[in-house]
């Protein structure tokens, strides 16, 4: 819903709310509850329900009584315990948001009853901002700003974090009224409470970074110019007075200052930065100091709203390469469709380069790579300025790259965009290479030597880390124009000559990374809906003696150990808990840490423990156990002793205590709450719990604890939680995934066997040895991965998987003792060109089976195609092994289908997705089989059931089909001649066609003739000589009996 107010009016509304009575921006928004917007189709939001429930508790206690009585009632209720304290705090908080007229009074009450320094309220504000802001009613948004202003005025500890979350919601490239209102409202708070702002270094840096970026968007109208001037004044004052705090931003501060350099105030600042750096701070030595400092991820992430960040992370972790178009289209419609949104592309590219660093498993999978998203962003730039800024954002970490300080992951996207664009989008590659060459002398001439060295170091590191095996194919490519190639040779002669002899890219190279999944020449759209494919000329390259370049080898990037820092959380902990956390931090050996961890758990379980500290404690533990979450979980050699030793880590003490408790115990709930808080901050905790329950003797038979854990998390759902944890495990440790698989399938059959989600996760990453291990588990009865009621659906789902994944799924299915008839209907879904994996697996399994009528029906239901040999292959095999049984089944099917569909029926059946068995199909397959058996001694078509069925079909089908299948029906003619002699006129009619006469006088082979005569003798002994004279339909009926 758009705001219907101008900038000044909105600001006035915000200031009105500050008095406790402001109506807010767009108060009375239609639809939804009092807090969130919704439609009649949306389910009621759980958070909103809880807040409204708490509000009704407060209202019921304070309605109709004096202010003093209300205060007494609230205080008495709060004293009952932590849950009651939380209810009152959240109730008053909700009243502040939904009742502007009562806001001042409710805030005063909140300040009086809060026992945790407003921690509950701060956490809830953060949750609303991160998860629900886009759905918040406008009144609530305005009141939220008012409440934050009051918290800041009161100097509440942690309010700076809420301000930073608020700033994150201000979208770049968006000048809609709501966004401008939010930018101005937060700026007003920061300006009014300047002394408070100056107490927090991180808030200073974050505010400067945010508003420096927003200044670029705010131009044009008088209202925007006024806001822009306020932003300029704010940033300049902080930069001049607190430059060293701003220095923590790193090199991206220079990039943002470049974008605003022509504004007079920043022009003066630039002069000081370049010519008089000491004027800003005695510790500031000059611009090179800034440029050589890498920008922290938190700054790059703060310029994307939570929704943008979620969508971008989803694309880079869940969407398969080739299936990204609809997600990109949605993102473009939502965020990149206006002229003002051009500036947002830089934020997105910096975020992708600096924050999105996928794991090796993701890098080596078919998940949409970072370079493809960046390529798409570059191709959608419509402004020259935006395109130049986007290219600078992409190469920014190259300019002063230092292998010791910077990450390969920051520079990898640029080289891969150029590499992969060469075939489908050579213009993109050319413009990026040109930019790379020209930025060296033009970025800042006095530092040209440093920039040259930075770019050279980047290219050198790229080759060393095997991101590309060598750069000559890129720099000296005939698709580039001569001038550009000449400039590249001049600037980078070291990288322009091919190595001799050719460098072999060995697959076992641990740091090799060769993403040569080029797109075919036919495909011109690798940044939208392209399928990943190798280039058409790859075979030619191989034939010329060059080593085939492998699709990808993940980078083994050296993990830079960041120092553990729990300082921000210590002040929020009780003194005794704080001491224990510090002991845990200082503990040098595992045993000492375990003792301290047990003391922490014991303190958490004490009756007077403040449960509001769980969140802070979880943040500390998450920080302290970073190395544990990064390290190997499963021991190299799996024995009982090594498993028991592996679960002796401090973190696992929480799990051990949980296993020793009764589930209805309040201590049990408290530990689950602690784990839930930990899970929010470190999702890996989920699969660590699964491992502990699987590996520890103390946890034997306690796997159901995981279900309690899942329900205690914010997800609140076992299936979702389990799948997310197994996905996290798959991305981190494939060995552990395989180790957990048997127990996960055994303990949670309803969650694992009903769909192919977990199976796909497993087969996507296992190798052949791990597959064989799982097959053994199945055959020994330790593992069940399929059950009869869902196996068919799972195998149908698997048809979209990669080839090796499908083969794995079939191998695992065949290890189970499930009758093949259960899955035979899958044949109706299989197309010979699209599903060769499933067809070959099914064919090999069918040859081991005795044919049933249902099997034969499904096999014959396949459409006839000259290149599809599936039906003929299996029918021929059954002819050799089970000829009599097959003949009976075919006879029965021919008789049942002995009526060609009418036109109306065929139209109806053709609209069905699944193939319907028709008489013509059966005859076509039989004719193909007849031709295949023509030169063999097999006498399948001389069997009585087949000949009888063909007789009856011939008697009732039309002339067109008699002609089409004349050779097939001729077999029945011979059987008819030898069994009964029909009237002359009938005989003449039967022999009237030349093909019939030829076949009548010259039988195909001796075996068929002898088979035919023996069949006749058999028929003569039965008292049924008059059947042949009846009408076809009655004959069919009696013969069927």
Curated annotation (Swiss-Prot):
Domain of life according to the entry: Eukaryota
Coiled coil: none
Record keywords, A-Z: Acetylation, Cytoplasm, DNA damage, DNA repair, Nucleus, Phosphoprotein
Localization of this protein: Nucleus; Cytoplasm
N-acetylmethionine PTM positions: 1
Keyword Acetylation: yes
Location of region: Disordered: 975-1041
Broad class of the protein's primary localization: nucleus
Modified residues (Phosphoserine): 500, 535, 993
Keyword Zinc belongs to the record: no
Record GO biological process: DNA damage response; DNA repair; double-strand break repair via homologous recombination; mitotic G2/M transition checkpoint; response to ionizing radiation; RNA polymerase II transcription initiation surveillance; snRNA processing
GO annotations of cellular component type: cytoplasm; INTAC complex; integrator complex; nucleus; site of double-strand break; SOSS complex
Acidic residues biased stretches: 1006-1020
Free-text function comment from the UniProt entry: Component of the integrator complex, a multiprotein complex that terminates RNA polymerase II (Pol II) transcription in the promoter-proximal region of genes.
Subunit details: Component of the Integrator complex, composed of core subunits INTS1, INTS2, INTS3, INTS4, INTS5, INTS6, INTS7, INTS8, INTS9/RC74, INTS10, INTS11/CPSF3L, INTS12, INTS13, INTS14 and INTS15. The core complex associates with protein phosphatase 2A subunits PPP2CA and PPP2R1A, to form the Integrator-PP2A (INTAC) complex. Component of the SOSS complex, composed of SOSS-B (SOSS-B1/NABP2 or SOSS-B2/NABP1), SOSS-A/INTS3 and SOSS-C/INIP. SOSS complexes containing SOSS-B1/NABP2 are more abundant than complexes containing SOSS-B2/NABP1.
Family that this chain belongs to: Belongs to the Integrator subunit 3 family.
The protein, known as: Integrator complex subunit 3
Gene source species: Mus musculus (Mouse)
Upper lineage: Eukaryota, Metazoa, Chordata, Craniata, Vertebrata
